[in-house]
């Protein structure tokens, strides 16, 4: 829209299927770039137009140790930025299985420790921000309008092959513009 990539989440809550036998789950709107990287810099202009979250995500679809090959992501909300190592944390298949067993709650918490970090920010609806996500080895940094706002060092970030970069929008609409990606040495 107007030269920008607009994402709109069309289903914001889980709903029963028409036959009532299953549930259709809400999911963020996602645009994937088939762009292999290891160490990279992703720069994008983000604009919140009713959405609650926008993100830059790194995946490896051939990796089976995490759901859908999710590796890491930087989530930006109006009040916070969260960096997640999904390979070792929330999307790790072993951890997802352990979460189904209430007796494993302590073990899940132990394994999840250090796989995400959240930092406060103050952003405004309708404003455009330049967001830069840098991954080098097992470290990810996020800056907004030239100011460093978030950092995480965790093993999954250093995954050898990130075959896909995804841009996501949750909770209605948001826009990405001037998308730039550099592979770092």
Question: Where is each model-derived feature located?
Answer:
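Generic beta-strand structural signal
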Residues: 1, 76, 135-137
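Secretory/extracellular carbohydrate-interaction modules
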Residues: 9-102
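Ligand-recognition surfaces built from glycine- and aromatic
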Residues: 94-97, 101, 157-185
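Short, solvent-exposed beta-strand-to-loop segments that form ligand-recognition rims
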Residues: 138, 143-165
């Amino acid at each position: 829209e107007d030269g920008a990539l607009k994402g709109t989440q069309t289903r914001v809550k889980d709903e029963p299927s028409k036959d009532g036998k299953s549930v259709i789950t809400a999911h963020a709107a996602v645009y994937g770039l088939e762009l292999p990287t290891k160490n990279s810099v992703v720069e994008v202009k983000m604009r919140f137009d009713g959405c609650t979250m926008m993100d830059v995500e790194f995946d490896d679809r051939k990796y089976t140790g995490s759901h859908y090959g999710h590796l890491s992501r930087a989530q930006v909300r109006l009040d916070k930025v969260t960096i997640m190592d999904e390979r070792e944390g929330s999307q790790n298949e072993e951890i997802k299985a352990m979460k189904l067993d209430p007796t494993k709650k302590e073990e899940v918490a132990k394994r999840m420790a250090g796989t995400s970090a959240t930092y406060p920010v103050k952003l405004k609806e309708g404003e455009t921000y330049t967001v830069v996500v840098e991954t080098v080895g097992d470290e990810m940094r996020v800056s907004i309008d030239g100011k460093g706002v978030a950092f995480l060092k965790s093993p999954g970030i250093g995954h050898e092959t990130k075959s896909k970069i995804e841009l996501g929008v949750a909770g209605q609409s948001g826009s990405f513009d001037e998308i730039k990606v550099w592979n770092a040495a």
